[in-house]
UniProtKB/Swiss-Prot annotation:
Record's keyword annotation contains Lipoprotein: no
Post-translational modification: The RING-type zinc finger domain is monoubiquitinated in the presence of UBE2T and UBE2W.
Organism: Mus musculus
Biological or metabolic pathway of the protein: Protein modification; protein ubiquitination
Protein name (Swiss-Prot/TrEMBL): E3 ubiquitin-protein ligase FANCL
Amino acid sequence: MDEAEASLLRHFPLLLPQNREKTVYEGFISAQGSDFHLRIVLPKDLQLKKARLLCSLQLKNILNEYHQVVQQRMKHSPDLMSFMMELKMILEVALKNKQELCVQPPSCSFCKDLLTEIGAIGWDKLACVESSFSTIKLKADDASGRKHLITVKLKAKYPVEPPDCVVDFPVPFSVSWTPQSSLVDVYSQFLVALETLKVFWDVMDEIDEKTWVLEPEKPPRSATARRIALGKNVSIAIEVDPRHPTMLPEFCFLGADHVTKPLGMKLSGSIHLWDPENSLLQNLKDVLEIDFPARSILEESDFSMDCGICYARHLNGAIPDQVCNNPQCGQPFHEICLYEWLRGLSTSRQSFNVFFGDCPYCSKPITLKMSGRKP
């Protein structure tokens, strides 16, 4: 017995040769705990290209939608062992898909209990329910009138097993659960969480409404970061703590050094003025001694956020965050665009993760310090 035959017997012990030439194999293939009868007839040269696969009616029905895939794999498999491994993989996928389509409908008592729980919450709070009753979406308004959704995914052993809950929160949301708990308990905890996050969302909404937020363009409720335009090619990136939203956030200024350095010095010198009783935006105005310009005002000026190399604002989800330090230029660039530009110049040089070269716009010296992101 050669190595190929031994491997076939080891992986498929129920499939045996029916003649000395080993051109006919018959037996069973196992998948998902079941055995399926099949017969494979090979030509004299044992090439799979001209082989025939004969299946039991049960196996034929399961593989019906995968007929072309099976034929293709048979045609391209180098030997019987390779084909059988691929056939088993296809069979596993087919059985899994069939099981998902044949999920048992919920019992009448399960549906009745679930409807009672939804009624206790209030039918006006129901946003959506799947026909299988496995996924339920509930809605709520917070104290500021913002609308929120919670998606509750019930498991097979509900209520013994806790459901999975999906929310658009900036912090983890875990449900306290016992076998006696219900949707009412989930919804109550959801409302409590909304109340604890009210101040955070108030802070973020004020920033979104009263400043020009460069990133993200359409922030979800879970977003804790904002990049805010301060003027021509200068911005501030902040990361807000959802649990302490009026405290000093993590921040960094983005732009040319001659603009960002004075702002950094001003903030450092006025940090003692930060008052957690005020909103985050008001505190930023006080310590920076500026009024955040509205988008309409900046767009009417010569403010530009397009990259000076690719001429686009967004590239792979990022906006330009590198700026020429020449006060007469100040052209913004995407990091990856500037990296590729400098790398292509024979006159540029590199020291560790810092590149030195000439600005594509004004030809003055420009420096690029690569971030941790891969270009």
